[in-house]
UniProtKB/Swiss-Prot annotation:
The record marks E73, V74 as: Cleavage. Residues 1-25 form the signal peptide. SMART domains: Carb_anhydrase (SM01057). It comes from the Eukaryota. It catalyses: 2 monodehydro-L-ascorbate radical + NADH + H(+) = 2 L-ascorbate + NAD(+); hydrogencarbonate + H(+) = CO2 + H2O. This is Bifunctional monodehydroascorbate reductase and carbonic anhydrase nectarin-3. It comes from Nicotiana langsdorffii x Nicotiana sanderae (Ornamental tobacco).
C-alpha cells in the first residue's frame, strides 16, 4: 500500500510539472514578450536574445528587407503564380500584436510542384518591406505552408488613396468586434481569398524569414510589384483592433547580406493601382 501511495504521489508530481512546462511553452504567443519599440529591451534589435528558440531573429537571412529593384535579377523561368484559392470558412483572431484571418481550406499556391496551403493572412502598419527605400502605409501577408512545414509568404503593400481595399471592406464590420482583446476569435463565415485580386505576374522573390519571433528562416518571400490603395479609415480599424503599443507593428528592415533578389519583370519603380 505504501509503495502504491508513493507511486501515486510521483504520478501527481509528474502531472504538475508537465502542466507547468506546457504553460511555459505556450507563452511563445504572448506578445508581451516582444515589442516593436526600437528603444525597448524587448524591441526588434533584441528579439534574438529574449528566448533561446528565438535566436534565428539574429540570423543572416532575416526579413523584411529593402528591395532595390535595379539590383534584382530578372529570371526568365519565374512563372505567373500558380494559385488555386477557393472560398473557405474563416475565423478572425486578435493575436494582440496583429489581426489574423485564419482559413480552414483556402486553397493553395504551387511552386516547383509543391503545394503550399493558404493558412492565414494578417496585416502590418506601416509596411515591413520597403521598395527602393520607400515605406508604404500597410502590408498584407498571405501565409502558405507545405505539408513538411515550409513557408511561402506573399507580401502586398498599400498606400493611402481615395479607393478602399475591397477585401478589407468585406471584413470591416468584423474588425470592430475583437477590438483590443487578445485571444478573441470570431467565425465570420465564408471568405473568398480570390477577392484580394492578385494577378501574380510581376513580383520579386527572395529567401528570408518570418518577421515575428521565432523569425524562422528559409521562408520564400514573394512581394507583389503593384501597390494597392487603402483608406485611412481601414488602417485605423486595423490599428484600433490590436493592443495598445502595437498600432505600429512593422519590424525594421534587416541587412540584405548579399542575398539574391529575383524578379519577373525588369523596370525601375513600382506600379500604382489604377
Amino acid at each position: 500500500m505504501r509503495m502504491a501511495a508513493i507511486t501515486k504521489m510521483l504520478f501527481i508530481s509528474f502531472l504538475f510539472l508537465s502542466s507547468v512546462f506546457l504553460a511555459r511553452s505556450g507563452e511563445v504567443d504572448d506578445e508581451s514578450e516582444f515589442s516593436y519599440d526600437e528603444k525597448s529591451e524587448n524591441g526588434p534589435a533584441n528579439w534574438g536574445n529574449i528566448r533561446p528558440d528565438w535566436k534565428e531573429c539574429s540570423g543572416k537571412l532575416q526579413s523584411p528587407i529593402d528591395i532595390f529593384d535595379l539590383r534584382a535579377e530578372v529570371v526568365s523561368n519565374l512563372r505567373i503564380l500558380q494559385k488555386d484559392y477557393k472560398p473557405s470558412n474563416a475565423t478572425l483572431l486578435n493575436r494582440g500584436h496583429d489581426i489574423m484571418l485564419r482559413l480552414d481550406d483556402g486553397g493553395y499556391l504551387k511552386i516547383n510542384e509543391t503545394q503550399y496551403q493558404l493558412k492565414q493572412l494578417h496585416w502590418h502598419t506601416p509596411s515591413e518591406h520597403t521598395i527602393n527605400g520607400e515605406r508604404f502605409n500597410l502590408e498584407a501577408h498571405l501565409v502558405h505552408e507545405s505539408n513538411n512545414g515550409k513557408f511561402v509568404v506573399i507580401g502586398i503593400v498599400y498606400e493611402i488613396g481615395l479607393w478602399p481595399d475591397p477585401f478589407l471592406s468585406m471584413i470591416e464590420n468584423d474588425l470592430k468586434v475583437p477590438a483590443n482583446k487578445k485571444g478573441i476569435e470570431r467565425g465570420i463565415g465564408i471568405i473568398d481569398p480570390n477577392q484580394i485580386k492578385l494577378d501574380g505576374k510581376k513580383y520579386f522573390r527572395y529567401i528570408g524569414s518570418l518577421t515575428t519571433p521565432p523569425c524562422t528562416e528559409g521562408v520564400v518571400w514573394i512581394i507583389d510589384r503593384k501597390v494597392k490603395t487603402v483608406t485611412r479609415r481601414q488602417i485605423k480599424l486595423l490599428q484600433e483592433a490590436v493592443h495598445d503599443g502595437f498600432e505600429t507593428n512593422a519590424r525594421p528592415t534587416q541587412p540584405e547580406n548579399e542575398r539574391y533578389i529575383n524578379s519577373t519583370y525588369h523596370s525601375f519603380g513600382i506600379e500604382k493601382q489604377q
